[in-house]
């Protein structure tokens, strides 16, 4: 039987983006070889690199390639030298254009503390000793960041007033809740929903709709937490969480807080999924390490590629349906850390420091 071939649009972007993306491609090709399928990568400009070359952060050629692709592997965009540009020409505008084009309404942020790195976590061992492994499912295209009315106005008496509006429909809540429950069903079957229903009407609706969707998933245990309490419980009992479901605003805060539990943002991937489907009927996902472009170390072979590599594992799982290969990549990352291999950002005495390319090769060699 012929090997299936998957088409991946690769958008390295700026700063360390090209280096870490190359590392991810190395590992993904190793996974494809080990598990009997083919990956075809096509590289296109985005962000500052695209602006420098053609004057726009999201060229038509890149857009068309993303339309054709089964998934999008992204590096990073941005840098200080672009900060003076008009917003629609800044590198980040390319990222937002992609989210809007494919209605990427769900952002997935795995929070996993690898046992060899527990000393790098700011939390005490008695709190994290039992392990930390949960995922935050954040609604990405609604809520207070996009609600109307919004703006700054001057009242008749000269007072200036800033207005933002938290708006969610039941349909918007239901679709992100359903994705959260589906992910929980494939994990440890526990979902924690976060809201401020005690003081916000949007929060009351959020909780009501989550409970309605929960009836479709009787095998998943549901817990509701107020957002301020959720922030505290992440620090008190992080090992108790499995899937945490949150609105755009609360998910933004909580995912950054939770990221610090893991010891390094160089290890943290993310996936954005939505309604768009690829040729295989699976989400045309967008996969991005959270660490940013880090222009101060770009081109020095010092960047940690593990977040980008773990983005590759998420791509295999969510957009290609290759759970076997995804687990193999994740196990290979765990293996290199267990063996004491490190990049500069996570090194400690007694470990071997590898550059970006060497770390990627080390992971690829352990994919089987």
Swiss-Prot record:
Annotated positions binding NAD(+): 79-92, 292-304
Annotated positions binding Mg(2+): 228, 252, 256
Alphabetized NCBIfam families for the sequence: leuB
EC top class named in words: oxidoreductase
One GO term describing the cellular component: cytosol
One BP term from GO: L-leucine biosynthetic process
Record protein name field: 3-isopropylmalate dehydrogenase
Site (Important for catalysis): 145, 196
InterPro entries on file: IsoPropMal-DH-like_dom, Isopropylmalate_DH
Pathway(s) where this gene product acts: Amino-acid biosynthesis; L-leucine biosynthesis; L-leucine from 3-methyl-2-oxobutanoate: step 3/4
EC numbers, comma separated: 1.1.1.85
HAMAP family: LeuB_type1 (MF_01033)
Recorded family membership: Belongs to the isocitrate and isopropylmalate dehydrogenases family. LeuB type 1 subfamily.
Assigned keywords, A-Z: Amino-acid biosynthesis, Branched-chain amino acid biosynthesis, Cytoplasm, Leucine biosynthesis, Magnesium, Manganese, Metal-binding, NAD, Oxidoreductase
Function: Catalyzes the oxidation of 3-carboxy-2-hydroxy-4-methylpentanoate (3-isopropylmalate) to 3-carboxy-4-methyl-2-oxopentanoate. The product decarboxylates to 4-methyl-2 oxopentanoate.
Organism, as annotated: Symbiobacterium thermophilum (strain DSM 24528 / JCM 14929 / IAM 14863 / T)
Organismal lineage: Bacteria, Bacillati, Bacillota, Clostridia, Eubacteriales
Signal peptide: none
Binding site residues for substrate: 99, 109, 138, 228
């Amino acid at each position: 039987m012929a090997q299936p071939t998957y088409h991946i649009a690769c958008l390295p972007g700026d700063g360390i983006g090209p280096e870490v993306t190359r590392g991810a491609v190395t590992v993904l090709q190793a996974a494809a070889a080990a598990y009997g399928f083919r990956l075809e990568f096509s590289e296109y400009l985005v962000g500052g690199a695209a602006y420098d070359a053609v004057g726009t952060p999201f060229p038509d050629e890149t857009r068309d390639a993303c339309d054709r692709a089964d998934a999008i592997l992204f590096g990073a965009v941005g840098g200080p030298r672009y900060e003076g540009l008009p917003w629609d020409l800044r590198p980040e505008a390319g990222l937002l254009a992609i989210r809007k084009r494919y209605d990427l309404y769900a952002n997935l942020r795995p929070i996993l503390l690898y046992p060899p790195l527990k000393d790098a976590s700011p939390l005490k061992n008695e709190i994290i000793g039992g392990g930390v492994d949960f995922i935050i499912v954040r609604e990405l295209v609604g809520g207070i960041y996009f609600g109307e009315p919004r703006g700054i106005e001057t009242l008749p008496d000269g007072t200036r007033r800033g207005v933002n509006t938290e708006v969610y429909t039941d349909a918007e809540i239901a679709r992100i809740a359903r994705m959260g429950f589906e992910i929980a069903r494939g994990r440890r079957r526990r979902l924690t929903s976060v809201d401020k229903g005690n003081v916000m009407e949007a929060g009351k609706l959020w909780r009501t709709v989550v409970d309605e969707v929960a009836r479709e998933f009787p095998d998943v245990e549901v817990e509701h937490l107020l957002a301020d309490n959720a922030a505290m419980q992440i620090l008190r009992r992080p090992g108790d969480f499995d899937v945490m479901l949150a609105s755009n605003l609360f998910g933004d805060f909580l995912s950054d807080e939770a990221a610090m539990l893991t010891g390094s943002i160089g290890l943290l991937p993310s996936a954005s999924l939505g309604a768009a489907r690829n040729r295989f009927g699976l989400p045309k996902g967008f996969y991005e390490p959270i660490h940013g472009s880090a222009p101060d170390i770009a081109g020095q072979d010092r960047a940690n590629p593990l977040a980008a590599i773990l983005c590759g594992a998420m791509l295999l799982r969510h957009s290609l349906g290759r759970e076997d290969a995804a687990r193999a990549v994740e196990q290979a990352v765990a293996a290199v850390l267990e063996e004491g291999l490190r990049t500069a950002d996570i090194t400690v005495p007694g470990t071997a420091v590898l550059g970006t390319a060497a770390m990627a090769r080390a992971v690829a060699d352990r994919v089987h």
